[in-house]
A protein has these predicted regions:
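Loop/turn-to-beta-strand initiation segments
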Residues: 8-10, 81-84, 161
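A contiguous loop/helix-start segment that scaffolds small-molecule binding in enzyme catalytic cores
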Residues: 7, 161, 165-208
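Class I SAM-dependent methyltransferase SAM-binding "motif I" and its flanking Rossmann-like core
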Residues: 100-158
Length: 208
């Protein structure tokens, strides 16, 4: 949307969620050609860049600096720099701080484009065996008890497929809470997606 002749462009670059071979040629070339890469965790992303011999300068853009850092990045874009945004894994802007930068870019008239690729949300959905035509994405449930209960309660009458991200150490608790709200509903547990030990377990919330 918009963008002036002098402005640079923001590239949202999807990176692998586990298997490095899932990166696209277009993303590799873009990461090599842009002036700057904004990464959620530069210590994590340097491994990816080194693997593909990408020498582009990196800067950190994460949940704790997103508002102020987005302003800095927008200024650099307005000065003509092309910037690529990458997340720790998967597609920027989905359950990560990327949406703030995208919003500020649109407000400033900066052109934003997305380079598609790996996305845990879609990967899990299409191999789950659950209905794919209509779905609801909740990302990670809040850790705050009150907020968490509000969201769980709101799902009680949800008829669409529900996709939730969860960390291994909280998985049992979350499955128990979902069972209390949704009953013995069909569910699929996807682990280690795209990796050597990927597993997909289909059952019900009551049985699992």
């Amino acid at each position: 949307e918009g963008g002036t002749n002098m402005s640079g462009k923001l590239y949202l670059c999807a990176t692998p969620i586990g298997n490095l071979e899932d990166i696209t040629f277009r993303v590799i070339n873009t990461l090599k050609e842009v002036d700057l890469i904004a990464a959620e965790d530069t210590r994590h992303s340097i491994k990816l860049l080194n693997h593909f011999e990408i020498k582009t300068k990196m800067t950190s853009y994460h949940e704790y600096n997103r508002v102020e850092k987005a302003k800095v990045l927008v200024k650099q874009l307005q000065e003509g720099k092309d910037i690529a945004l990458i997340t720790d894994a998967g597609t920027p802007g989905i359950s990560d701080p990327g949406e703030e930068l995208v919003r500020q870019c649109h407000e400033a008239g900066i052109t934003v484009t997305a380079l598609p690729g790996a996305c845990a949300l879609i990967n899990a959905l299409i191999i789950s065996g659950q209905p794919t035509r209509r779905f609801c994405f909740e990302a990670f449930l809040p850790s705050d008890k009150k907020e968490r209960k509000q969201i769980l309660d709101s799902l009680e009458n949800e008829t669409r497929s529900i996709i939730i991200y969860e960390a291994p150490h909280r998985l049992v608790r979350t499955l128990e809470e979902l069972h209390e709200v949704l009953g013995d509903r069909s569910m699929t547990l996807c682990r280690e997606l795209t990796k050597k030990h990927e597993s997909v377990f289909k059952s019900t919330l009551g049985e699992i």
